[in-house]
């Protein structure tokens, strides 16, 4: 999976697991259709909606030069009812 970096586990993303929504950080150059294709192919699920946003960049100074560190987007992927991604499923307590 070229475009997907890793799954994100924040308070919000863990809360969204109950709504069958999964959060991933993806390469900034990847398109929405590529990400949808990779998720459906790799996890064998059906995607019904995708939301994406860019995170604010963090500054990084190396002597006199100021740069930034983040080069990715965050995608929130909603799956059809009945589908789930097993390693990321929330445990019921």
Swiss-Prot record:
Coiled coil: none annotated. GO terms for biological process: translation. The keyword Ribonucleoprotein applies. InterPro entries: Nucleotide-bd_a/b_plait_sf, Ribosomal_uL23-like, Ribosomal_uL23/eL15/eS24_sf, Ribosomal_uL23_CS. One of its GO terms (cellular component) is cytosolic large ribosomal subunit. One of its GO terms (molecular function) is rRNA binding. Keywords: Chloroplast, Plastid, Ribonucleoprotein, Ribosomal protein, RNA-binding, rRNA-binding. It is found in: Plastid, Chloroplast. The keyword Membrane does not apply. Disulfide bonds: none annotated. Part of the 50S ribosomal subunit. HAMAP family: Ribosomal_uL23_B (MF_01369_B). Belongs to the universal ribosomal protein uL23 family. Binds to 23S rRNA. This is Large ribosomal subunit protein uL23cz/uL23cy. It comes from Glycine max.
């Amino acid at each position: 999976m070229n475009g997907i970096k890793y799954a994100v586990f924040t308070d919000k993303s863990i809360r969204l697991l109950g709504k069958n929504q999964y959060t991933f950080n993806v390469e900034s150059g990847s398109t929405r259709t590529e990400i949808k294709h990779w998720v459906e192919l790799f996890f064998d699920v059906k995607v019904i909606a995708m939301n994406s946003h860019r995170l604010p960049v963090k500054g990084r100074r190396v002597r006199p030069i100021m740069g930034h560190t983040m080069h990715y987007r965050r995608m929130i992927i909603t799956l059809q009812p009945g589908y789930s991604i097993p390693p990321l499923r929330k445990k019921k307590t």
